[in-house]
Amino acid sequence: TGTFGHGARPDLANNPMDCFTTLYQQLSAFRTRSVDPFQCLTFSLGFVKSGEKYNVIPDKLTFGGTARFFSYEKAGRPFVEFLKKALEQNTALYGCKAKILQMPEALFEVNNHPQCAALGRTALEHDLGPQHIQDPQPWMASESYALYLQKFPGVLTFTGIANKEEGCGANHHTPEFDIDERGLIYGTAMAISYALAFLNNPQPIKFTPNPEPVEQLAKRNV
């Protein structure tokens, strides 16, 4: 929040856009300046809203976005701490005020349990054939299944739904997104195959659950 003013006299106003642009540049540069180059961190904005008239300096600005990472401790937590610090210091420097409207605790990354992943691969190669199994690149989208893996061992897999002839396979959150529903058959088969292998596995799964209360973990879900 800044101070309203006329475009002819910016010196008599306090434009929150000035504060925001500095903050945005700092957040964008945080990855290269402060995070291990072997750690992944992305930052993007989904919206910035401020003002309605070309000749009126607004008094408010709101913005929202996400930061994605594969290590909460090495990338996620440092980014959140820097965001809060930079927001406080920049608003003080520019004579503005700021309030965080919504920022839940960071969601954990999905890490498949090694034993479960090996068990699932063996089962799927046997039931579906090794030619149908791929190792995809790490995925940057947030996934609430990460919370389940904090309490129980498990594995997350993806089912192919692309079909160019049917026009299926566009990116998520786009108007063109659609799935080839025949892929759901293989997803069901994968789940059954893994469940049977897990239940018939004679080797105990070594796992230490996160001691954080379930109610607290649930608050991380965006």
Predicted regions and their residues:
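His/Asp/Glu-rich mid-to-C-terminal helical/loop segments that flank catalytic regions of hydrolases
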Residues: 19, 29-30, 81-85, 129-131, ...
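Catalytic-loop motifs flanking and including active-site residues across diverse enzymes
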Residues: 16-19, 23, 116, 144, ...
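Short, solvent-exposed loop/turn segments at the edges of secondary structure
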Residues: 56-60, 152, 172
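Residues in well-ordered beta-strands of folded domains
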Residues: 46, 101, 158-160, 178
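Acidic, glycine-enriched loop/beta-strand segments at the rims
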Residues: 56, 135-139, 203-205
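Domain-wide signal for the mature, well-folded portions of proteins, strongly enriched
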Residues: 69, 82, 88-95, 119-124, ...
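Midchain, well-structured core segments that form catalytic/ion-binding scaffolds
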Residues: 1-112, 139-140
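Active-site-adjacent substrate-binding region
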Residues: 25-32, 107-161
